[in-house]
Every structure is written in C-alpha cells, then in structure tokens.
Amino acid sequence: MSTEDEKLLKEAKKLPWEDRLGHKNWKVRNEANVDLASVFDSITDPKDPRLRDFGHLFRKTVADSNAPVQEKALDALIAFLRAADSDAGRYAKEVCDAIALKCLTGRKNTVDKAQAAFLLWVELEAVDVFLDTMEKAIKNKVAKAVVPAVDVMFQALSEFGSKVIPPKRILKMLPELFDHQDQNVRASAKGVTLELCRWIGKDPVKSILFEKMRDTMKKELEAELANVTAGAKPTRKIRSEQDKEPEAEASSDVVGDGPSEEAVADAPQEIDEYDLMDPVDILTPLEKSGFWDGVKATKWSERKEAVAELTKLASTKKIAPGDFSEICRTLKKLITDVNLAVAVEAIQAIGNLACGLRTHFSASSRFMLPVLLEKLKEKKQSVTDPLTQTLQTMYKAGCLNLVDVIEDVKTAVKNKVPLVRSSTLTWLTFCLETSNKALILKAHKEYVPLCMECLNDGTPDVRDAAFSALAAIAKSVGMRPLERSLEKLDDVRKKKLSEMIAGSGGGDQAGTSSVTVQSSVGSTATGNSDASFVRKSAASMLSGKRPAPSAQASKKVGTGKPGGGKKDGSVRNEGSKSVEPPEDVEPAEMGLEEIENRLGSLVKPETVSQLKSSVWKERLEATLALKEEIEGLQELDKSVEILVRLLCAVPGWNEKNVQVQQQVIEIITYISSTAAKFPKKCVVLCITGTSERVADIKTRASAMKCLTAFCEAVGPGFVFERLFKIMKEHKNPKVLSEGLLWMVSAVDDFGVSLLKLKDLIDFCKDVGLQSSTAATRNATIKLLGALHKFVGPDIKGFLNDVKPALLSALDTEYEKNPFEGTAAPKRVVKTSVSTSTSSGGLDSLPREDISTKITPNLLKGFESPDWKMRLESIEAVNKILEEANKRIQPTGTGELFGGLRGRLLDSNKNLVMQTLTTIGGVAAAMGPAVEKASKGILSDVLKCLGDNKKHMRECTLAALDLWLGAVHLDKMIPYIIIALTDGKMGAEGRKDLFDWLTKQLTGLSDFVDAIHLLKPASTAMTDKSADVRKAAEGCISEILRVSGQEMIEKNLKDIQGPALALVLEKVRPGFVQEPFESSKAMAGPVSKGVTKISKSTSNGTLKQGNRSRAVPTKGSSQITSVHDIAIQSQALLNTKDSNKEDRERVVVRRIKFEELRPEQIQDLENDMMKFFREDLQKRLLSPDFKKQVDGLEILQKALPSVSKEIIEVLDVLLRWFVLQFCKSNTTCLLKVLEFLPELFNTLRDEEYCMTEAEAAIFLPCLAEKLGHNIEKVREKMRELMKQIIQAYSVGKTYPYILEGLRSKNNRTRIECTDLIGYLLETCGTEIGGLLKYLNIVASLTAERDGELRKAALNTMATGYQILGADIWKYVGKLTDAQKSMIDDRFKWKAKDMEKRREGKPGEARAALRRSVRDSGPEVAEQSGDISQTVPGPLFPRQSYGISEQMLERTPVPRTIAGVNGPTDWNEALDIIMFGSPEQSVEGMKVVCHELAQASNDPEESAIDELVKDADGLVSCLANKVAKTFDVSLMGASSRSCKYVLNTLMQTFQNKKLAHAVKEGTLESLITELLLWLLDERVPRMEDGSQLLKALNVLMLKILDNADRTSSFVVLISLLRPLDPSRWPSPATAEVYAVRNQKFSDLVVKCLIKLTKLLQSTIYEVDLDRLLQSIHVYLQDLGMEEIRRRAGADDKPLRMVKTVLHELVKLRGAAIKGHLSLVPIDMRPQPIILAYIDLNLETLAAARMLTATGPVGQTHWTDSTANNPSPPANSADVQLKQELGAIFKKIGDKQTSTIGLYDLYHITKSYPKVDIFSQLQNASEAFRTYIRDGLAQVEKNAAAGRTPSSLPLSTPPPSSLALPSPDIPSLSSLDVKPLMNPRSDLYTDDIRASNMNPGVMTGTLDAIRERMKNMQLASSEPVSKPLMPTNDNLSMNQQSVPPSQMGQETVHTHPVVLPMDEKALSGLQARMERLKGGSLEHM
C-alpha cells in the first residue's frame, strides 16, 4: 500500500462512521466495514446502544458498487446480526430488500454471505420480512438471482423447520416457479417442494401443489417423493429459543413409559392441511344453482338434488366463512323430512359444512345438535351411519366442545327411545376420547353424575355405553374424579368399571410406548442421516445431486463466534447447528457385583463388606469410613455415579437404622454439592428414597438439605417434576405433606424463575388442595402463598374453582406473603440452567388462546352504527379477558386490535374511554408479546392525549401504565416521540405526557434510550404554554440523569435554544453559551426560568469577552473578536445540509401579515445556527443592534462572492429581515433597507426569481410596514417594493399590495394606494384581475383622512387616463358625494391631459384595441404597449382557458418571453421538458407565438416544419399537465396550468399538427385530461372553474381535430377499468370503483361525439384498425362477461355496440371487407362477427340498408370451402348486391354524398365494371346526376377534400323511385327496428317506415319533420362541453330505456348532413309544391 493510501486511511479513521462508509475511496469504505465487523464482534450485550446507532447504515453498505467492499459489508452485517437481538428487526425490511436487489447476482462468496445474512434475520424472528423479500426476489427477471433466493428459502425451511417458516407462504410462491423458463429455477422449486414434504407430509403438498404443475414435473416429483421421509427436525433455533435450551434440557427428563417432553417438542410439527388451503366461497354458486327453489319443491327427488348440490359444494376442504344461518335452518327442517333419502343427504351436507367451516360453524352446530341427537332413534343403518359420522365430524372439526353440549346430552340421555340414549352416550365416549385433559377436567363434574345415573338404565346397551364413557374419563384424567362416585356402586359394577379402565389404559399405554420408541428411533436415524450433510441448494434434494459432506459446513460463511459473556455462553453454528443429544436421565439396572467391579480401588474392600453387614453398628462405621474416603478423593467428578449407586445398593434405601440413614444422606449431599457435575441419573436414583426420608421426623432435616443440594446441582425444575409423581402416588400422606413444605423452602431459596409454574399450580390444585389430609392442604396453602410472593395476584386467576373455604384460607396466606416481584435468589444453580430465566417465572403461567372467542359477530359489533352494540363488543372483550384469567396468547388477536383501534376514533367519548381501558387490559393480559401483536395501536392510544377532557387523558395515561407493565419503556419510546412532535396534540396532552415520562424515568437508575426524548423535550422548552415548558424542563432533568454524560454530549447537536443552556449547565457546570442571549432577547417572555439563567450568565460572558477583544481601530464600527479571527477561514454560509424544498413546504402562504410567534423565532435561530458561520450568526442574533449592523456589513461585503449560497438560504435570510422590520430600532432597519436593494440586484444578475414561498415570507410584512412613521424609511421601502415588482411579477405582487389597502395603519393604506396607481401607470390595465379591485380604491374616497382620499383620487385619475369613461364600470357602488368628488378629479385630469397634449382619457387604449382587431397581434406589438408595459413575468392571469374563442384570438406575442427567456423553438421545447414550472411557462410562450405565426402563414410551410415536433411537444405537455396541476393544488398559482392548456389548445387547433400526434401520446393526454376533469380538487384551486372550462374546450378540440382512427382506438381502450396508480390522488377501493364509473361515463360521452360525426367523417377513419380495436375489446370481455354486463346495462359495452352498429349501418355488407386485422379463422369465431351479422340482419329488416345476402347465414371463412358454386359467380353476385345498396344511398338525398363516394371507390377498385349497365331502368336525369357527382368526387379527392365538405346538388326526385331491376325494392322488406322507436338515433328512418306506402318520405308531414330535424341540427352549438364547468361535477346522464337492447343512445340524426343552404331551399320548394297539391311520385 502506498504512503498516500496509508495517509488517506489514517485520516479517514477520524471521520464519523457514516462518512467512512460512504467515502468515495473504496479502500476507506472497505476498512470501515472491517472495523465495523470487529466492533460488533466485541459486543456481548444485545442491548448495547451501539447496535441501535449502526443498524440503519447497512441499507447502503450492502448495496456498494464495489464487490470486495460489498462482501466486507456483508461480513459486518453478519457480525451485527449475531450480536443483536430481535430489536434489530426494525431494520430488516430495507436491508433485506437491498441484499436481494444487489447481492444475489454477485460472486459465489457474496451470495453465500447474503444467504447467511438472510438466515440470521430469520433467527432474529424477522420471518415475515424475509418472506416478503423472497416474494420480490423470485420475480427477478434474471434467473441467476432467483436460484439463490429459492435456495435460501430452502435452507431456512430445512434448518428452522415449518414452525418458524410458515409453509403456506412458500406454497403460494412455488407455482410460478414451476413454469420458469430456467431449468435451475425449476430444479430448485422441486427441491423446496420435496423439503416441504419432509416437514408437512406428502399428502398436503400433493393436494395443494400437484394440480398446478405440468404432468412431466408431477412424474418427476412422484419418483423423488419415494426417497423422501417425513418427520424432519429443525437443526437450528431462533434466538429467543436458544436462550431456553438449557431449561428445556433440564425439564426433558420424566419418569415412566410416556414420551419425554423434549421428544414432543422436537417431534415434527403436525401441519393441518386445512390451514394451508385457501377458502372457497360456496354461497355464490349455491345461489345460482337453484338451491332455494329445489329445497321447497314438493317432489322429494328435487329436494334431494338441491341438497346434493350443497353437499357437493361443501365437500371442499376449506369453506370461506359467510352467513349460513338460513341454510342451516333449512337443513334442520330437512333432517326430519319424511323421505329418508332427503334427510340422509341433509345430514351429509351438515357434516361437510362442519368439516369445511370448522369453528365458523360452531353456532350452527349447536343449533342443529338437538335434532341430530333426536334423529338417532332411526334404526336403519343407511341413516345411522352418516348421522354418526356427521356428529363425530362436528366434534373433531372443533364446531362443538364438551362444555357446549352438556344440556343437549342431558336431554338426549333422558329420551324415551333407548337407542337415542345409547347412541348419545356412544358419541359422548368418542368426544371424551378425542378431547384434551384440560377440557375434560372442566366438564367431568357434569358428565360423571350423568353417566353414573345411566348405569341404572334398564337397557343393557345404555349401561354399556355409560361404562365406556366413564372409562374414557378415567383414562384421560385419572381415577380421582370417579372416587366419590364409585363408592355408591355395588361391587359387580365397580369391578366391571375397573376392568374396563385397566383394559383400555394398559393396552393404550403399551401401544403408545412402543410407537413412541419406534418413532423416536426412526426420527433419530433420519436426523443422523440428514445431519451428515449440509444442503445449501434446493436442487440438492433431487436424486443424483448429493450435497457436500458436513465437514465443509464448518468452513461456510457466518459460522458462530464464541461469546463467553453472551446469553447462554455460546452462539450456535450459523450454517448448520448440531443439536446436542439430551442427557440420559433414566439409570440402567446395575447389580452389586458389577458396582464392586467398577469401584476397583476407589473404596476399600473391607468398607464395602462392612456396608453389607447385618450389624447396624458395622454399617454405621462403614458409612463413616466411606465418608472420610470420599472427602479425601482428588477427582471426585469421575466417580460420582458409581459411588451413588453403591450407597443405593448397600446399605440401600431400605435401611432401618436412623443413624445409618442419616450418614448415607449426608454422603450423597456432600457428593452432590462438591462435584462439579452431578448427573441427573444420580438424582433419579436417590430422589425416591430421599423423599421418603423427608416424611420421617428423625431424618427430615438432612433429607430436605439433600433435596436442596440436588436443586443446586441440576436445578429445582427437574427435582420438582420428579417429586410430583412420587408424592402423588405414594401411600404415605406424610411424603406428600412434608414434600410440599420442603417445596415452600425451595421456592423461597431459588425463586420461581426456574420452575414450570403451570405444572406446579396444577399439582397444588389437583393433588394438594384435593387431599383429605388437613396437613397436606395446609402445606399446599403455604406453598401457594410462597408463590404469591414472587408471582403476584395473577395466581388467583388459576384457583377460582377451588372451594370457598380454601379460597379464604388462601387469601389469608396471600396477605402474609405480599407480592414482592422478582428478587435475586438466595441460592444459585451450578449448571448452565441458571442462565436461562426467560422460560420460567411469571411467564410460565399458562396463557389462554382466545382466537376462537374473537368471533366475526364480535368484530362486526365494533363497527355497528348503534353505540350500544359497540359497547357490548368492548365489554365482551373484557369478559373474555376475565375468563382467561387475564393471561392470553397473542395468537389471532390482530383483528381484535384492528377493531379496538377503530373505536379510539369513536364519536362517543365514553366508548373511547372504555376502549382505552380495554386496550390496557389486553396489554396487561398478553404481556411482552403485545408489542408485536398490537400492530402499532399505541400511536393511536397516545393521540387520545390530545383530547381536551381531563377524564379522557387520565384514561389514556392509565392505559399507558398498563402497557408499560407489559413491555419495557424502550419499546414505547418511538411512539412517544411521534406523539410529542404531533402538532395536533394540545398543550394539556403534552404536559401530561411529559409528567408521565418524568414519573417513569424517576424510577430508573440507568436508561440509555431516554436520550431519544431529549430533542422533542428541548423543542417543548419553547412552547407557548408555560405548563408544557415546565413539564419539559422536569423531564429533561430526568433524561440527563438516566442517560449519562457521555451519551448526552454525543447528542448535543440535536438541541437548540433554551434547552441547550439547561443541558449544558447540568453537564458542564459554569459553561455559558453566547448565542443564548439572542434567544432570550427574541423569544421574549417565553420562559421566566430560562431568562433568569441567561441574565445570570450573560454578565460573566461579557466580562470574559472584554479581556480577549482587540483594541478597536479609530473610526471603525466593526469590532472583531479573537474567536472571530480564529474562524475566518471557514465559509460564510454552510449550505451543505440545506434542504430548501423541505423548508418551503411548511411555509404558510398567507397574504395577510402576522407577527412572528416564539416557535417561529426559535426555528429561525436554529436554521441560522445551521447555515451561517458562527461569528455571523452571533452578530445577526445578538440583541445589540450594533452587532446586527456589523453582521449585515459582513454579509454585504461578501454578497457578490456568495450569491449562490445566498439563494439557497434566501428564505432564512428573508425571515430574519421580517424579524428586523418588526423591531423598533431605526439604525438596524435602515441598514437592512440599504442591504435589500443590493440583494435583489444580485438575484437579478443571477437570473433568480423569488419562489412563492419566499414571497409569502417577505411581501406581507413589507406591504404592512410600508407605512412606517419615518419618512426616510417609507421612501426606501417604497423604492424596494417597486424594485421587487419589476424583478418578481406584478401578477404575484399586487395581491399583497391590495391586502395593504385593508391595513389598520393609514400610512400603509396611502402607500399601497399610490403603488396601485404606479402599477396602472407603468403596467397598464393588462394585469389580470387588477381592475376588479379598483372599487376598493374608489371606496377610500369616503375616508376621513385627507391624505388617504387624495391618494385614492390620484390613483382613480390614473385609471381614468388609461380607461376613459370605462372606469365607471369598475368603481362599484358609491355615494353621490363620492361620485361627484371623483368626477371633478376626472375632469381636472382630462384638462391636464389636454394641456400636455396627451390626447383624451382612454383614447390610446381604444386605438390599441382597434389595431389588434384589424391587424392582429403584430400591430399591438409594434405599438409598444404590450411589449413595453408587460415584462416577462407580467403575463395576465386571466388570458387562459376561459373559452375556446378567447383562446383562439389571444396568441402570445414573441416578446412576451422576456429578456432571459428562450429565443427559439428548440430551446423552448427543451425548457418545457426539463425546466421548472416557472421556466416552462417561458418556453410555452415561445411555442405559442411560433404556432400563432405558423398558423397565419398562407403557404403553410412553417406548419410543415413544426409537424415533426408535434408529437414530442404534446407528449411533453401531457406530462406537464399532471405536474402543473399537482403544484397548483399545493397552493401555488394556477398560471402554469393555464399556459399548458393554452399551448395544447393552440397545437390542436391546427389539423396538421393534431394529426401528427401518435396514438400512444394521444392516449396519455386524453387520460390525463379526463382524470383532471373528474378530480374534485380542481374547483377548489385558484381559477378552478376557468380551468375546468379550459379542460372541456381542449378535450372537444382534440376530438374535432385529432386523427379520427387514433381517437376511436384510444377511447375504446379507455373503456376498460383504469389502473388506480393513474389517479392523481389515492383512495379506497370503493372510491376507485366510483371514479372508474365516472371516468368511463366521460369516455362514453367522447365516443358519442365522434360517433355523431361518423356519417360525414367515415372516410377519415381506418375502418380495419377501428374494427380491430372493437374486436380486442369484445374478446377481452368474453361472452360470459358480455352477457352479465348486458343484463347490468353496462354503458361502455353499449357504446362499443353502438359504434359497431353505426359502422354497419353506414357501410352495409361492405363492412366485411374491413376485417383484415381481425382473425376471422380463429375458433371459436370472434365475437365481433356475430354482432356484425346481427346488425346487418336487424338493419335490413328495419329498411335501413339493403340486404346483400341471406341474413344470418353469412360465411366468414373462405367461400370456396362452403359454396360449390364458382368463385367468379359469387364475386359478381356480391358486387351486384353492393352496387344496389349504393344506388339506394344515392337515391336518398340524405345519404347521396356517401353513396357517391362509395360508388367512386367501386369504380377505382373494379375499373372494368360498367356501372351504368345497372341503371338501364333509371331516368336519364338520375344517370346524369351520378356522372356529374362522380366527376365532382374525383376532383375533390384530388384536392384532398372529404365528403363532409362536398357541395353536391340534390338528386332528381324521379330517380328515387327507379331502382335497378336487379336490386330488391326497399319497400319489399319487413320493418323490424333494432332499437326502441323512441330512440333519437333512428327517429327519421323508423318514422318513414311507419308512413303510408303511397306517400312515404315525400309527404308534407315527412318533409316538415325532416326540416325540423335539420333546423335543430343546425341550431346546435358546434361543441358541447363534456363536463359541467361549474363547481358541481356531477354528470347529467340521460336515461336510456331498457328496451334498447344494450345500444348506447347517440343523440344524432344520421340522415341529416351538416346544414347547407341548397338542401334547405330544396326542401322548402318541395313543401310549397306539396301545399299546392302536387305530390311528387316516390
């Protein structure tokens, strides 16, 4: 390494960690990560505060672009995760996402370490985050990244097991991996599938996954499954379980034949397939199946079929919950149906429902149980078998429990039918056998007497069933519950019952034992075989891919590091931690001879022989000798077991001599207390004999001492557990009573942390308190009293069901042993058991799972509109807590917390208080788990402190107390910090919260996390409320006390203001900070206590400063201190950490000025301290005005060199100027006014314009202070305001000046009035909105102050000079005196103008208007009025978006772009695309000007040049629409919105430009415009109604001028539901549905407009493309959806049908020639073909077109395939038919133009066809008309004109009656209109079809009707707005009759062409002839 690198690394070590880790040099970053890893390796305490400081850094470090650095970062992360605990989970999401994104595609080492890190996150219980990340990772497009992700999931599942990694999440991810294109990914997916089979079994995996696989993959997996053995065991545990391991080992030793608890714990977790399935909704298909009609049918077969359908649907494995109450009522009736087949089907349906719904079917099961039990009377096996099966299913599925069915069983066993009684008892036996012990213990008191009574039944079957039930109870809970009842039985029955119990118990026990042994051996073998391999890859599960041997596992990345002081002494191997085999506690048999052989020379042979002696004295001597020998042994540990075995054999525990017994016990006590390790085997060998010796008063003391020694050796948990069984079964009651008394002393010595409290309490309750011996009961009471001392009152909840007398005795004992909490034990355990404390103690008290009690009805009650129902739900939760003894598990409480969270926002305050109490109760009952289970509800609880009611706040604090009792304060700190900084919380709430915190901190001696409270507490020191400040001060004192000085000094940078002085005084006594003077001076009377501190310290500071100051130079006003000189080298302004946008976001944009509040002053100080150099900020914040002037001079001198920095902190500087304006010191104010013009000149030179936020900070104050009482100050302020007007914008400045007119200061009003006159004089009246405020100025003429009246009259005179007499429109209502006064002033002004030869008032403005009207904008521009008086930023606001006409005639002049704006088209486009909103406006001005110029070019060459940029321009502007509207919604001006819309309008006014816009761009633009039309926030914006109008007009212009094909295609595509992300603002699903409905309605309106004009524009449309888009839309919907929507009257579908209908109507059969883009050969046929056929048929029937073939039998495929006739004949026929249809069109005046165009296209397509040969029977006039028409069409086609503008004459009337003989007459067809005759769309045609055949359309009535329609059409406006443009955005849709068969109503008249004079005059002439009686022949 070079010297430079070494130097760099050395220097870098001094930097903070964040700077090192983010350093630009990779070597620095690399070394930083290595150092960080070593720091974590040195941490042994998971609560070390350093871990919290570093956690957030890894998000960036693991994403490092340098591979070696990234690898080291992963090493550091692994070290961090090993050192941390589950608290590190807060960083899991962001770090895991970064690893998945950046590390999984790297080098092998990097991938391995990334996987190791993921597994450590799992170990820290961040499983959900891990799986969320994996869900994203497997969607990566790069297969190389997917394989490691799948592999790490595989490793996690393989190592931690399915208990930690939920299989359901993985099962959901696998299906998409099965079809992955990469084979490695597929192989990994298979491997994970096989691993799942090891954990949850093959059947669940098969049933869930196999149906989603391809057949080949199924076969492969089937073959692999043969090699997979179920019963996997985890090889690694999560961190919290690792802590419990020693205790788990200690408690794993049991006596007897049953399986050990450890074996149970490590056994493979039984996964219920039900939990892995997704629920299926069966209610919806059931409704559609006709079930309800079927079950009411009279025929039994129909009823059976209906129920069978339900049975079939309910056979799914998991049914979605719903309302099954009506179904169950129906089934209950059907159970008793007269037809047994129906009844059996109903019973089977109930069974299926119970199996699929489980606990959700509980209420329904209880409802139907009595009927089902009654049905047991049926003797037919076809009924009894399904009935028995259903009853058993209901119980197994958890729908019923023993407690619920007591009453129903009692009723059934008293039934008069013996079969019902016996079957009920048989079912009860089944229930008892499948229930757990706890449930039977609850219910046995009810069932035992019931069964005993049934033993006397007269029917043998009933008696046998009762015996079976009693045997089941005894088998489960033992004989104790039956003892008293057995006394009443005779010997025969007693003997029979005993035999049954013995028979069932013995057999079962043996079976269980053997099974357990086999499974244990099998699983051990499996575990051993698997343990020898480390499977890092999921693909290694597949055959032929054997994993690497475990020897390599030790080398893998992330192996555990030794940590002596951490947790249990070591950290397991991270990769594949091996589980140590449990200690063998059961001693093997060993004879005396073998013992002697093993003893060897350890004990003298004579001693052993004496121990065997029958003489007690010899035995005594031998024991004494043995004791001496043992005491002399050097290595006792190796011989412990053999010595204990010797003593147990000789003299043995049957020794009768007391002295010998005592010696034996003392020797064993000595061995157990002296040996380093005393095996549990030895305890098992001795404990029975020792417990018996406790019962003897002579040996009691030594035996108890021995038991205590055992506890010290192996832990009290193991000793207690062994004693329970011995004491319970021993015949000597003294063993029990004295053993209990020893337990009392043991609890006192060792505490309860190492005991299993649940087992101990159960033993006391079931054995001790139930004993008939008083001594035993008393000893038990003492033991429970001792437990109370450690556990507290919670123990009472577990003893509620004991007898009242015992309860009172217990209460007395509790009083003697009051709760003291956890204390240090008097004795300690030698083994590692002592380190595990988390598994015992209070937390061992049993917690109840309440998830089943949180029913949907309970949760629904929380949301009930009835407050009583909501209260009932809250009280129900309290009741559940009581029933659970206030000890609950977190399982399934997520929805409960959600319901309670909603009630915290209840309008009923009493309910909120009840909820707070309940939440506190839930927290106390749940314990530490509440922190994770509550889903952040604590933040909502804290919000309740913002209530103004004291009682509410007290309830909140009580809830916080209970919460604190459950979790530690450090878990609550993040929520408390948010609450303290919440602006909505009132002063009382903050004060109460600070007091509460102070109280909690007072009880702590050391609490590092309190440092996080320092910042919010210091902020509160500047609060307006004195109570809050006082409470915050008290809290800060406690924070400082518990945090420690080192931690405080690290965090001093976060503290400013008064709190800083307080902190420094406590941390560094005597320290004083100078800037605090300014705080005192500016904050004023904020805090009296703080002010005193500043006074007492400021004197000392000044004296000390005087000594160190240099002698001031004569004549110099600047005094430079030594400290200032020392920091001169630093930058004057530090803008490194400045974020101007964030500061401006919180600026309140007010026009009216308000004095600064103390907290605003404090914020200003804080910002100045951050950004200004120390000497500068000290001067500017000093209370001494001279220092402030000095500071300004420093800034003034540096101004040219720090202009960029000044701009960055301009808002801070302006706030300081505002502060100075509010002070009374004139010297400082004059200096400020001297500095400000220079500042604004600098800003102008930098081409910087103030932002709106900066203007809102400064201008209100400047406008208000214009009326200063010193003339000199007023003058400077006046000039400053004029300078700002020029630099900023008149349009944005004059609102502040207008606000000044409302000031209470008359001088301010005078100045503002003069400024308005100045604005009128210099800027004219073109300032948008200024004229409408002249009435305010005019009203000032009535004021008393003469100066104010004079100023108002002068301003009015200026306005009169410009406007002339028009000014009277703007003056508002005035008194006669005011009018007279103003009029006199106007006359004087007119005379004055005459003298000066300035013309007459208003003359110049009128001339300008005329010139603009006559010559366009150029003349106005040349006149100089606009260009001179309106600089760039002064563009009038109201010139946008008012109406289409206004937009068209307001082109933007070129010079309006301003001096610094863009100068050409390309530059303007760049600025629009990349500039800020303000800069974009300048670009748009140029674009508008260029467009206006190009539009006026007669040769259109300029437009042709711009066409190439049209699409790019519109695309850019479409993006700008959203941005500008978003900015305006945040409070900014709507100026940029208007410019965007105006530019778009100018673009789309030109057809060439509009046609150049591409389809994609058009879609984006239309979508954006329609969305903003619908946005309810737009009307609330500035000029919102104008913007709505502009949006409407622009939308209509787009529809008019854009490419028709693109418009149609885009709008049809927009009929689909819109993606929620496209909407401008987020909302709920319901709101999105409503929005989509409104959006589609608008799209439909647009399509209606286009469809109206289709007749005249059809040749502009690419019909092939349009039909393709309709085809795609219909195919996407599908026939099922179309049918559903047709029934629901869906508007989008109706609209598409309408467009298709219009196309078919206009083109007839020729429409089939436009299907080139539709795949007509596909199967099934495209839906569009059926609709075209239907329209052709219907329109032909309605005489709206000529049928061209057999309707409904059109062949869409190749005609040769289906038609044997030659193709030529077919083509001729088709051509003839088409010509016939065209001649019909030409014969009708309304469609003649279209017909001629069709005929023209035919002649071009078939030039050899003689069309006039078809017109032999037509009149010569008609043929001539056709010839002339074709010639005209050809001429128009050459000129590029469309049919809509074709000026053709009316066809000869006589021709209409002379169709070609080859063409069928129109009148010969039956009329069957498709739509309702009232439909506007088809009014004329249908009316014509209903007329008298003799008259037809030529009658007088028909012509009148047609004229009326034409006149209506001509009178309609050209464009109707799409949306109402006022604030009410509701759309007035016209209702459409349902008889219109799904077609959209289009209000158009297809037979009426655009109005022309010739057509109208021709009709009028015909009407005159009809009136004269000469009807034309039709």
Curated annotation (Swiss-Prot):
HEAT repeats: 48-86, 165-202, 322-359, 363-400, 442-479, 849-886, 890-928, 932-969, 1008-1045, 1230-1253, 1254-1286, 1287-1325, 1328-1365, 1535-1575
Gene Ontology CC entries for this record: cortical microtubule cytoskeleton; microtubule; phragmoplast; plasmodesma; preprophase band; spindle
Key words, A-Z: Cell cycle, Cell division, Cytoplasm, Cytoskeleton, Microtubule, Mitosis, Repeat
InterPro entries (UniProt xref): ARM-like, ARM-type_fold, CLASP_N_dom, HEAT_type_2, TOG, XMAP215, XMAP215_CLASP_TOG
Annotated SUPFAM superfamilies: ARM repeat (SSF48371)
Annotated SMART domains: TOG
Region (Disordered): 230-264, 501-587, 1087-1115, 1393-1431, 1837-1862
Keyword Signal on entry: no
Ranges of compositional bias, category Polar residues: 1093-1107
Location in or out of the cell: Cytoplasm, Cytoskeleton; Cytoplasm, Cytoskeleton, Phragmoplast; Cytoplasm, Cytoskeleton, Spindle
One GO term of the biological process aspect: cell plate formation involved in plant-type cell wall biogenesis
GO molecular function: microtubule binding; microtubule plus end polymerase; microtubule plus-end binding
Observed phenotype of the null mutant: Homozygous lethal in gem1-1 mutant. No visible phenotype under normal growth condition in mor1-1 and mor1-2 mutants, but the restrictive temperature of 29 degrees Celsius causes cortical microtubule shortening and disorganization, left-handed helical growth of root, disrupts microtubule arrays during mitosis and cytokinesis and alters plant morphology and organ development.
Biased composition (Basic and acidic residues): 238-247, 565-577, 1393-1403
Low complexity composition-biased segments: 510-527
Superkingdom per UniProt: Eukaryota
Tissue: Expressed in roots, cotyledons, rosette leaves, stems, open flowers and green siliques.
Other remarks on this protein: Aberrant cytokinesis and cell division pattern during pollen mitosis in heterozygous gem1-1 and gem1-2 mutants.
Purpose of the protein: Microtubule-binding protein that is essential for cortical microtubules organization and function. Essential for maintaining the interphase cortical array and for correct morphogenesis. Promotes rapid growth and shrinkage of microtubules and suppresses the pausing of interphase microtubules. Regulates the structure and function of microtubule arrays during mitosis and cytokinesis. Probably not required for cellulose microfibrils alignment in roots.
Family to which the UniProt record says this protein belongs: Belongs to the TOG/XMAP215 family.
Protein name as catalogued: Protein MOR1
Source organism per UniProt: Arabidopsis thaliana (Mouse-ear cress)
Lineage, highest ranks first: Eukaryota, Viridiplantae, Streptophyta, Embryophyta, Tracheophyta
Name of encoding gene: MOR1
